[in-house]
Structures are given as C-alpha cells and as structure tokens.
Amino acid sequence: LQVALDHSDLQGAIKAAVSVGQEVDIIEAGTVCLLQVGSELAEVLRSLFPDKIIVADTKCADAGGTVAKNNAVRGADWMTCICCATIPTMEAALKAIKTERGERGEIQIELYGDWTFEQAQLWLDAGISQAIYHQSRDALLAGETWGEKDLNKVKKLIDMGFRVSVTGGLDVDTLKLFEGVDVFTFIAGRGITEAADPAGAARAFKDEIKRIWG
C-alpha cells in the first residue's frame, strides 16, 4: 500500500504523512506538492521515516539525471518518469538514482495518455521494470471507472515482466476488481488522507489487500 500526499502545501502533506506513515508501505511525495515546495518534501519525509520507501512523483519528462539526483540526495528511493520521456532521459534518471540509492533506487514509468506496448518493451530493455497504471483524476471526474480494458492492459504489462502499480479513485470497495491480478502496489491519496480516520482507512485498505491476495 502506497499513500500519495496529494497536497498543495508542505504542512498538509507532512500532517498527512505523520497520520498514516506507520500504516503504509510506501510514502509518495505527490507531484503538486513537489512543484510547490521542491525536493525538500522528500528530505522531510526521509527524516520522518528513515526506513520507508520514499517516492518522488516528479513525472519527469526531461533532465532525468539531474532531477533524479536532486531528489535522491534528499532521500527519494524511487522517482517517476512520464511515459513520453525519451529512453535517454529514463536511462539517465535510472543511473542517477542508483548512484545515490544503490539497489534500492528505481525509476517508475507513469502511464498517461498515449503509449504502446512496443514502447514498454524499450523501458524493460533499458532496465526499468516498474510501471504505474492510472485512471487520471480528470478521467474519473468525467465519469470513467476501472473496466475490463484497464485490467487487460495491466495483465499484459505484468506478463511482459513489469511490476505494475495502480492508482486513481481507489477505495476499499474497488480493490476486489483486481482479484486474480498480481498488482505490485495500490496507490491511494485522498481516499486515505482525507478520511475521518486516516490511519484506520489505511488499515482497512491493507486488511482488504491481505484478504484478497493473502
């Protein structure tokens, strides 16, 4: 279970992190907050949670090596690149994050908009084996939900050799849609952080994950 700190301010993000950090496996410095406050967010999260995996959700499109180094030196283990970034950008990001974080360092590819399985094979060939499948916030607001076409794409990526995380409008009740699919990580943001009891919401997510996947 990964919590996404989808906040616009540092105080809100840190307050949410403290409320649920011990209940989740991975803590994500969200894109909007990183744009507001920079990689300082990763540094604060690392100081609060020295043993957790910290993700910088930069959605990096260019300058991969520089962006990855800047976040990794602040404590990020994983960083995201957008799927339309060039292979050299992704490779530079991977090299930089591994230089700082060792084997713990990884790049995740964010699947937004148009992408192909042919491109995905190039990411694997470049040494990147994590992908994040989205239902975007805007798509969800437009009324789209998780369907068979999404699940089939997730399954194909897994069959190719990716560890696939899923995100977008997830709650405890939607987890069962993925039964039988070897999802790597479920990423939830406001579904956890804006709950009346965030820690309880995180525990409910984890209980349902354990119930379905054991």
Where are these regions (language model features)?
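Well-formed, non-transmembrane alpha-helical positions, independent of function
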Residues: 19, 44, 70, 122, ...
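Hydrophobic faces of well-ordered beta-strands that scaffold small-molecule active sites
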Residues: 1-5, 27-29, 54-58, 79-81, ...
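C-terminal helical cap(s) of enzyme catalytic domains, especially alpha/beta-barrels
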Residues: 93, 147, 179-181, 191-214
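Conserved N-terminal beta1-alpha1 strand-loop-helix module at the mouth
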Residues: 1-65, 73, 194, 199-207
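Short, small-residue-enriched loops and turns at beta-alpha junctions
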Residues: 7-11, 31-36, 60-63, 85-88, ...
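Conserved anion-binding
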Residues: 63-161
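A C-terminal functional module that forms or caps the active site or interfaces directly
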Residues: 148-181, 185-192
